[in-house]
Amino acid sequence: PVTGAMWAWLVLAAGLAATSIAARSEWLGIIGGAALLISAGKWALFDTIAMRVAYGAATSVAPLLNWQFAAGIVVLAAMPVHVALLARRVPHAWQLGSAELAPEVLGVVAGMICSVGVLYAVSFEIDRYFASPAGQGWQDPYQAMHTAYSVWWAVFATVMMAIGFIRRRRAPRILSMIVFAGTLAKVFLVDMRNVEAVYRILSFMCLG
């Protein structure tokens, strides 16, 4: 029921967004974008975190290949797409009362929300996998899970850095450095906490 409700929210938000683009309506576009943002917030805070805390991991579905993950990815991707398409139809600054919203700024914000959301979504699926019987079959599931987190975060940061340089955008590069720093700190403090200090220092220097 929770995932079904999420898809209903997504269809409604996408309908508002599509209508705003077709009508070249600034205010309807802002409402559609807000609806997408609220839907993404519901998915991140309630559908995943709250349900995980209350009922445990939903291991009856395959990691990555499930409707909950798909809903999250779709709603996250819809936000920057909505801003980009509406910016083409309404290229000037959008009026919200006395305030002006620049499409370029909104595009960057939507892109960063989407990127962080994807990072979170895959991390959540890693948690789902290691809570399942298959994940528990590892010799040390806890260590394997944290290693998987670190690998995914490092891959994500590398991709964001590449996007930042290829497209000459500062925001992806900044996000990449933040994620890299967090990954290095996690590797040093969590993944290698049982390793002797001298090897932790050497590994940290090499990773840096």
Where are these regions (language model features)?
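Alpha-helical transmembrane segments of multi-pass membrane proteins
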Residues: 1-208
